[in-house]
A protein has these predicted regions:
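Active-site-proximal alpha-helix that buttresses catalytic centers in soluble enzyme cores
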Residues: 1-246
Length: 246
């Protein structure tokens, strides 16, 4: 038996993880999909707790699906380190980690739909800025966001990228963009319009030249996200059939 574990960032703020859990129940309401949710932050249902509970029930093989758009510290360090620690205490355990969600073509389609829907309502938009979390340590998030921007470059206006952290930081770059393109559409590349997105929007609105900025919504568990996650699970199931055949 191979068990699917969807690993989310989570938060220590009261009620946030419960709200996300409800989002997933709605997302997969009609899908024939068996999975367990685990969180990197929070006191309950942590990745360690979920895996160790399943091991105590006799499960040895796990498909780990990070519900992260782009690869950074959580993907390269936190999730693997937690799993390595568990395996150190329980050597028979095996796991495979899926790719992040942001490289899936459907994510590009979701973002393009958000841009197109805004341009229908506002034909004055001069440029689109994709806003992502980024990383102060890893270059992979910036590369992935730039690749996504290239795939979204179908509207005849410039598609640009800024990050919250690392090279391409929005504090450094956004004012220049807004000065050149006052009518800017900003698309937050986040799974939900949570605390970080709201705080960043507030900071941007206080910047110079930001009076004509338009914000699209974050991905916010649109139905197509279910396809992305199911495809990542299917990819792992193919690998699992090979890896766990013995």
């Amino acid at each position: 038996v191979v068990v699917n574990i969807l690993v989310l960032h989570g938060m220590n703020r009261p009620g946030v993880n419960e709200s996300v859990r409800e989002n997933f129940e709605q997302l997969f309401n009609d899908a024939q999909l068996t999975y367990h949710l685990a969180f990197l932050e929070g006191d309950t249902q942590t990745l360690k707790q979920v895996v160790e509970l399943l091991i105590s029930k006799g499960i040895k093989h796990f498909n780990i699906i990070p519900i992260l758009l782009f690869p950074a510290k959580h993907y390269f360090e936190d999730i693997p380190n937690i799993l390595k620690d568990i395996k150190r205490n329980y050597p028979p355990m095996n796991y495979i980690i899926a790719e992040p969600l942001g490289t899936h073509q459907t994510i590009s389609n979701i973002v393009k739909n958000k841009i197109a829907n805004t341009l229908i309502k506002n034909d004055k938009v001069q440029t689109v800025v994709l806003l992502a979390h980024g990383s102060s340590t890893y270059t992979e998030p910036r590369q992935a966001v730039q690749h996504l921007a290239q795939s979204c470059d179908v509207f005849g206006i410039p598609i640009q990228t800024v990050l919250l952290y690392g090279a391409g930081n929005y504090v450094e770059h956004l004012e220049k963009i807004l000065k050149q393109y006052p009518q800017t559409l900003i698309v937050p590349l986040f799974l939900r319009d949570g605390y970080l997105v709201q705080r960043t929007k507030q900071n941007i609105r206080q910047q110079a030249f930001a009076e004509n900025v338009t914000f699209a919504s974050a991905i916010n568990f649109v139905p197509d996200l279910a396809k992305v996650i199911k495809d990542r699970i299917n990819e792992l199931e193919v690998l699992a059939n090979v890896c766990y055949a013995s």
